């Protein structure tokens, strides 16, 4: 039976009936590109959401947009992306701009990427906090840092043309959308690259079809390459017969014949047949092959029924109709290019018809599984976990496949699929529930999930994560583009433990100008400019700063930002920042944080009891005076130390004298042990021993405002030297105790004057709350950057660069760990023989 499902799907938000509230777009009478209709749709949707109408500010051009102003541009229909625009407008007011017409934008040759284009916006609807929006003109035009849009909309051809071959990250393109809309290509990716079950499929294609390689094989998909379908009818009949009689078709009684390819996407053109009707099936396939083009295919596939589970007795004697379930998932390319499931929505329909997007109102996964007879909560949770894993595997496979395409095939060197919809059905295979992947899309799942979230808010459900996750991903990619080509002055290269800096700088496109004391440092060949200058005697950092400024002037260097990741150089970096007029922590604040006794002495005046009693030691006389003020047991360590070198638990004055004598004898200057602060001298500190568990808190602070915080746990330290033994992330502490640590770390930084930067704070948590050990006025060292990136996604290095540029980093508002890491410390002196 031939079935045609064509035309608008009225329940999807993209096809809502619009009311014209304000008539034509201000200043765009008779707009031929449909901007008026799109603008009216935007106003109607804002009204339905209870938000104010767009304010027309186009008469007064907006000026002053520079290279550090972020612009995320959405091209095309406003409806699918409206929640994302509103969320992004709240997170970064004015950064999200909606472009409704090709006349609002222009393409100019890229200055940074030959052969590419920059997208300039002369007009757009920008979104602010509180759901406010404004129609604005931009003089000079704003340069887009990230572009996406409704590439799958057949009426939006101008969207694809504007977004083609751009020099900024582009979330999709028309060629990529066409690949997603081609059911055969999608199933090949899902089966061959993601190892997901798909309906048994026999596909006939014309010619070589290079987008469908023979390797790796796609389980469940049989590909037949035809040269002339009219002359190969016997081959077609043989393949159809073998498919219908094959083992893969044994569980199924019906098949579907349909054309596939992006031109056929959404038409619903298909015919359904019983498996026994071999002649009719072959005839239907042959009829479709007559009009086959090289971009299309003809599919013969099993009609996989939705699993039927035992249900409780019905309340009504009325017969139960067989139903079908479609599971719609939306996944985005999140931090570190990792797939992240954003939302799931289900639609239910009659079993004899395909359940399509927009044919029914969406509902939640958990309630749908309950309705289907999955009673046990643990089984429903297991299915939800499998669905997340399958969806994210599909996205990972798609990204890997796209990476193998040429820039022309992708629609640009910077074009990638950032938002992916994957449809599944719940089948029963060998008496077990199985998620079968059906198809992919670039827009329909987004619309369905947006509708599901709006419906939830209508009955008092809290806002979901979908708009936040998508807005954060877009803003993050825009910020990555924002830092490309920026000149960063780095003070101090550090050791091998900082090798990741050079790799990250290359990946982010940073131009590093390095000031380093070692003229033979390995990083000299990895940076844009190497400036050897011996600054190891840090007690003269004011003079060093003047010399560094002279070096920059002599080279004609004007960096956009200056910072240091190396503990010894943080004060010098702050002084150079001040001399250049760049953003960074004040030198006085860094000095307070760098010198441990000054840190605690400064914080003693604070009403919050985070500081620990301590005394500075420069002589044995100081030791005698300190033991009268600091109770034993106590901790003796270097005043400016790093890496726990020289730290020791002392039980009495004699042990303190002995430890101080050893340190003052063996550690005199930087040559004795580079990188542990001896350039500041070898003064010591005696501080009260604080019981409790030890933790690191890594903070991102911008203008005194906390943007991000991550708590990690340290295992019990090995006394008396307090060597770190283990660590884990995320913290095992309950949320309220982590909140105590974060608040204490933030208050300590603020009290010291550290208002801009990425800082690492070491604390102990006892029964009475947090106590400060020390503040490191730089990014957390050793494993912390890599671990935070692996577990949560954000990169502390990028965050530090953005803060130094004067741009508040976009970080996850509700960070959720993607994995758990635990590590055991191994030292060459202790474990070298065992590990050899």
Residue ranges and their predicted role:
Residues 1-61, 316-317, 335-339, 350-486, ...:
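ATP-dependent carboxylate activation and anion-phosphoryl transfer catalytic cores
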Residues 492-508:
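N-terminal basic/disordered segments at the start of proteins
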Residues 8, 18, 36-49, 78-246, ...:
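Conserved N-proximal alpha/beta basic substrate-recognition cap immediately N-terminal to
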């Amino acid at each position: 039976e031939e079935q045609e499902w064509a035309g608008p799907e009225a329940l999807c938000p993209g096809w809502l009936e619009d009311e014209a509230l304000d008539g034509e777009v201000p200043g765009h009478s008779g707009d031929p590109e449909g901007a008026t209709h799109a603008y009216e749709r935007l106003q109607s949707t804002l009204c339905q959401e209870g938000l104010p109408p767009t304010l027309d500010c186009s008469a007064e051009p907006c000026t002053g947009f520079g290279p550090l102003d972020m612009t995320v541009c959405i091209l095309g229909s406003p409806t699918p992306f409206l929640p994302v625009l509103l969320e992004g407008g709240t997170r970064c007011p004015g950064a999200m701009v909606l472009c409704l017409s090709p006349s609002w934008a222009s393409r100019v040759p890229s200055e940074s990427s030959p052969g590419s284009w920059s997208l300039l916006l002369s007009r757009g609807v920008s979104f602010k906090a509180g759901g406010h929006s404004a129609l604005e003109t931009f003089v000079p035009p704003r340069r887009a840092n990230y572009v996406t849009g409704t590439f799958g909309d057949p009426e939006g051809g101008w969207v694809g043309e504007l977004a083609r071959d751009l020099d900024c990250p582009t979330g999709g393109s028309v060629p990529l959308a066409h690949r997603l809309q081609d059911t055969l290509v999608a199933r090949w990716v899902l089966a061959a690259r993601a190892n997901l079950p798909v309906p048994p499929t026999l596909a006939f294609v014309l010619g070589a079809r290079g987008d469908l390689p023979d390797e790796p094989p796609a389980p469940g998909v049989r590909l037949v390459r035809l040269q002339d379908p009219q002359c190969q009818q016997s081959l077609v009949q043989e393949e159809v017969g073998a498919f219908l009689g094959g083992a893969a078709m044994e569980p199924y009684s019906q098949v579907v014949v349909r054309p596939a390819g992006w031109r056929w996407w959404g038409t619903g053109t298909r015919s359904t047949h019983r498996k026994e009707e071999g002649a009719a099936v072959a005839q239907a396939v042959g009829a479709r092959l007559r009009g086959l083009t090289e971009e299309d295919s003809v599919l013969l596939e099993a009609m996989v029924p939705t699993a039927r589970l035992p249900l409780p007795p019905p309340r009504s004697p009325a017969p139960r109709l067989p139903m079908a379930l479609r599971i719609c998932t939306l996944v985005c390319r999140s931090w570190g290019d990792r797939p992240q499931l954003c939302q799931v929505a289900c639609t239910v329909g009659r079993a004899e018809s395909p359940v399509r997007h927009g044919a029914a109102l969406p509902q939640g996964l958990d309630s749908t599984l309950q309705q289907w007879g999955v009673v046990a909560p643990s089984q429903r949770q297991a299915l939800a976990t499998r669905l997340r894993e399958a969806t994210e595997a599909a996205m990972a496979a798609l990204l890997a496949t796209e990476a193998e395409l040429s820039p022309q095939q992708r629609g640009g060197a910077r074009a990638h699929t950032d938002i992916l919809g994957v449809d599944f059905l719940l089948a029963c295979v060998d008496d077990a529930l199985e998620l079968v992947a059906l198809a992919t899309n670039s827009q329909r799942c987004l619309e369905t999930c947006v509708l599901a979230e709006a419906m939830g808010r209508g009955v008092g459900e809290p806002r979901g994560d979908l708009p936040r996750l998508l807005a954060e991903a877009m803003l993050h990619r825009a910020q990555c583009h924002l830092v490309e080509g920026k000149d960063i002055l780095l003070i101090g290269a550090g050791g091998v433990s900082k090798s990741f800096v050079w790799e990250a700088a290359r990946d982010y496109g940073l131009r590093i100008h390095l000031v380093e004391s070692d003229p033979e440092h390995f990083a000299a060949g990895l940076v844009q400019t190497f400036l050897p200058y011996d600054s190891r005697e840090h007690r003269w950092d004011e003079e060093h700063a003047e010399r560094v400024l002279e070096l920059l002037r002599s080279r004609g260097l004007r960096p956009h930002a200056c910072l240091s990741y190396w503990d010894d150089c943080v004060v010098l970096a702050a002084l150079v920042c001040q001399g250049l007029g760049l953003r960074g922590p004040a030198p006085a604040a860094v000095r307070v944080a760098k010198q441990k006794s000054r840190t605690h002495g400064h914080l003693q005046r604070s009403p919050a009891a985070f500081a620990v009693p301590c005394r500075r030691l420069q002589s044995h006389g100081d030791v005698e005076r300190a033991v009268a003020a600091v109770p034993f047991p106590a901790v003796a360590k270097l005043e400016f130390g790093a890496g726990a070198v020289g730290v020791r638990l002392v039980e009495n004055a004699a042990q303190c004298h002995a430890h101080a004598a050893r340190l003052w004898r063996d550690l005199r200057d930087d040559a004795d042990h580079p990188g542990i602060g001896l350039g500041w001298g070898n003064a010591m500190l005696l501080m009260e021993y604080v019981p409790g568990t030890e933790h690191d808190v890594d903070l991102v602070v911008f203008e005194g405002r906390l943007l991000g915080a991550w708590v990690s746990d340290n295992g019990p330290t090995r006394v008396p030297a307090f060597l770190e033994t283990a660590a884990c992330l995320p913290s095992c502490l309950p949320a309220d105790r982590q909140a105590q640590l974060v608040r204490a770390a933030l208050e300590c930084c603020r009290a010291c004057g550290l208002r801009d930067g990425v800082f690492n704070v070491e604390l102990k948590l006892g029964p009475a709350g947090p106590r400060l050990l020390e503040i490191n006025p730089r990014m957390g060292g050793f494993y912390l950057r890599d671990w935070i990136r692996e577990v949560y996604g954000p990169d502390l290095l990028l965050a530090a660069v953005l803060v130094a540029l004067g741009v508040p980093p976009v970080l996850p508002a509700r960070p959720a760990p993607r994995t758990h890491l635990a590590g055991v410390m191994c030292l060459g002196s202790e474990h070298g023989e065992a590990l050899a």
